[in-house]
Curated annotation (Swiss-Prot):
Residues 1-29, 167-203, 237-260, 282-329 are annotated as: Disordered. The modification Phosphoserine is found at residues 19, 27, 39, 65, 77, 101, 113, 121, 139, 191, 205, 207, 210, 312, 332, 368, 371. The gene is Cdc42ep1. PROSITE patterns: CRIB. The modification Phosphothreonine is found at residue 34. This is Cdc42 effector protein 1. Interacts with RHOQ and CDC42, in a GTP-dependent manner. It comes from Mus musculus. Residues 235-284 are annotated as: 3 X 7 AA tandem repeats of [PT]-[AT]-A-[ENT]-[PT]-[PTS]-[AG]. Probably involved in the organization of the actin cytoskeleton. Induced membrane extensions in fibroblasts. It is found in: Endomembrane system; Cytoplasm, Cytoskeleton. Pfam families: BORG_CEP, PBD. Residues 38-52 form the CRIB domain.
Length: 409
């Protein structure tokens, strides 16, 4: 048994006592034996002894006594075992010879390692794997198949699955096939197979980003909503919107007589008329005296040699029927005045109704503007003069009391 190791790191067992070896000296062993030959602790394994290739031995080598040969040769068991091992190590290329067979042989390793049973390996670079790469098929073998170089390959039982890559020539052919519209239907069916096939052919691309999924989700919900809205708006656009105040037909659309040249008509909506052209049409208001009359535009006329007309503070707007006419020497009311009074009493005139009636009156009144300019000697239309507060009217005379009563409401 070797002694304990010295403090200087040199072994206490002399290598010179190994006479059968004869190829190592003590000085040579001391020179080659250094402290860096001992590795640091690895886990829970303690490096307590060392046997070098050059024959240097130190540490606790008592466990080698059990393998020193026969049980009877106890005197040479440790050193003889080391000597034989060193001789075997020195011979290059000669495998070590088994000195003693173990009592119980170790069981053979399992064909499939439980640690790597579910692992996925990279393709093996051998001839069989290269042939499978060219074919481009994913095959699963029921039993482990041995390759040509002697290395056993892993099949389905080992849990190894190798996905082969296609050569560049086959990739270009697949791309041309994808661009062909005739194969588009086949490509969509192959993307989602209905049932698995025994040996399906898989096409592998360069990256995961090149995977194509052809999914048709149909028309979007937004397009459906827009279609329903367009259908609902179409009938609403065709239906006319009823007006708040439907226009009522005029009582007498056709005028009874053409207004003379000196007819004076006040039109509030027409701003281009001269200031002297004032329209004053009688309204069906009750008069306290036969010598006074009220007109729709707020002008009160007092009959006499010099009748004074003053506008009332409240204006009612243009309420002019299309059949109101009178001449210079006298007002001829007749049936037109009675019909207009009845129509006004029956309904209320709005501004839109007055504008419609005004549009029918304008062509008739337009012919009298020239004569009015000559009679009243007004300035040109470009000069806008203010409307006078009082107008002297001498041309209004009632025919008789009966006609005045017809105007009353």
């Amino acid at each position: 048994m070797p002694g304990p190791q010295g403090g200087t790191g040199a072994p206490t067992m002399s290598l010179g006592k190994l006479s059968p070896v004869g190829w190592v000296s003590s000085s040579h062993g001391k020179r080659r034996l250094t402290a860096d030959m001992i590795s640091p602790p690895l886990g829970d394994f303690r490096h307590t002894m060392h046997v070098g290739r050059g024959g240097d031995v130190f540490g606790d080598t008592s466990f080698l006594s059990n393998h020193g040969g026969r049980s009877g040769n106890t005197h040479r068991s440790p050193r003889s075992f080391l000597a034989r091992k060193l001789q075997q190590v020195r011979r290059v290329g000669v495998p070590p010879r088994r000195m003693a067979s173990p009592a119980a042989p170790s069981p053979a390793p399992p064909p499939i390692s439980p640690i790597i049973k579910n692992a996925i390996s990279l393709p093996q670079l051998n001839q069989a794997t290269y042939d499978s790469l060219v074919m481009g098929k994913l095959s699963f073998d029921s039993t482990p198949a041995s390759s040509t170089d002697g290395h056993s390959g892993y099949g389905l039982e080992s849990g190894f699955c190798t996905i082969s890559r296609l050569p560049r020539v086959e990739k270009h052919s697949n791309r041309d096939r994808d661009r062909d519209p005739d194969h588009s239907q086949d490509r969509e069916q192959s993307s989602f197979p209905s049932e698995p096939t025994p040996n399906p052919e898989l096409r592998r691309s360069d990256s995961l980003l090149s995977f194509r999924f052809d999914l048709d989700l149909g028309p979007s919900l937004l397009s459906e909503l827009l279609g329903v809205m367009s259908l609902s708006e179409a009938p609403a656009a065709e239906t006319p919107v009823p007006t708040a105040n439907p226009p009522a037909p005029a009582a007498n659309p056709a005028p009874t007589a053409k207004p003379p040249a000196h007819a004076i008509t006040t039109l509030d909506a027409v701003t281009s008329l001269p200031a002297s052209a004032v329209t004053s049409l009688p309204a069906p208001a009750a008069a306290s005296s036969p010598s006074r009359g009220h007109f729709p535009n707020g002008v009160t006329s007092v009959l006499g040699p010099a009748a004074e007309a003053k506008p009332s503070p409240v204006g009612e707007g243009p309420q002019v029927p299309s059949n109101m006419t009178f001449d210079r020497h006298g007002a001829s009311w007749g049936a037109s005045r009675a019909s207009w009074g009845a129509s006004r009493a029956s309904r209320h005139y709005t501004e839109m109704d007055a504008r419609r009636e005004l549009a029918g009156v304008l062509p008739q009144v337009h012919g009298s503007w020239e004569s009015l300019n000559e009679d009243w000697s007004t300035p040109p239309a470009s000069v806008r003069a203010p409307v006078p507060t009082s107008v002297q009217v001498n041309a209004f005379e009632f025919a008789d009391a009966e006609e005045d009563d017809e105007v009353k409401v």
